[in-house]
Amino acid sequence: MAEVGLLPFARVALQVATQVLPPYRTRFSKHQFTQPQLLAVLCLMRYEDWTFREAETRLREHQELRAALKLREVPDYTTLYRFLRRLDDVTVERGLGETVRRLRRRRRRAVSVAIDGTGLSYNSVSTFFIRRLEQHADRSARHRHWLKWVIVVDVQQQILLAQRAHQGPGSDVRSLPGLLDVAARGAPIRLVLADAEFDSEPNHQHIRQRLGAKSIIPAKRRGIPQGTIRNQMFRAFPEKPYRQRAKIETIFSAIKRKLSSRAPGRSLSIQIRQALLLGLAYNLYRLRHPLIWKDVNRAINT
């Protein structure tokens, strides 16, 4: 559970949602709840790791929270679920872009970014319990699938610039160009840090030729790599600037400890949307706590 107040988060979530969604989907929509209100509630659910029923209960109990969201009535849990099913990934991406714009304000400096992925559980069962089950199960009963969440972050400001999610396990080497193109729309990029999973000559070329940035990606240890840039990485790897990549692990840790380590849902599409909303909720959380993260950055850099 997050440690900061619900009311400031709810207010900023509603402000951002209002910028990316019209009040109603069509002119025939019921004027009971606006789309920004429902999106703000979904972000609040990710922020507090609530279920749909828990969200309905908490809103019913918390009059000030309803006032912060400008709710005259409490949405039923089925209303929230139906809105989540209708919500598209483009809307969440626009919401993330709006948070980046607010977090960066008028900064124009180019940023160093890191890209990496992590696994999210789609249920409430702990990974410890799953591993214990695997110890007593045959090979066919092993837990093989999870949701993989890949993000691009500004390593200095520690905010999300782009994200995607898909069923894991699987390689994300081909997803790097698209993610970086989205990230570059929010902030100019000068340096890209990634681990060996994203190692490929086309990725290096995309970063250097298309984005005009420097790339640091370790070459996979399978003999002398092919490609000019990969060969340079193999023979003279820049260790010192690459250390900044560890900050993306700090962000993953903060999200899983303070917000949630789950992307709940019975269908893959719902799980993916829950993961993307988790990234949006994290940036909204950052909008409320810039000073805390300045202290974290200072501690890491010393």
List each language-model region with its residue ranges:
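Polybasic low-complexity intrinsically disordered regions
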Residues: 30-31, 35, 47, 82, ...
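Basic, amphipathic alpha-helical segments enriched in Lys/Arg and hydrophobic/aromatic residues
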Residues: 238-302
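Major-groove recognition helix of helix-turn-helix-like DNA-binding domains
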Residues: 68-87
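Helix-centered, glycine/charged polyanion-binding patches within enzymatic domains
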Residues: 196-263
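Basic, short loop/linker segments at the boundary and entry of helix-turn-helix/winged-helix-like folds
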Residues: 2-47
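DNA-recognition alpha helix
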Residues: 53-69
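A short glycine/serine-rich beta->alpha loop
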Residues: 24-30, 65-69, 137, 265-267
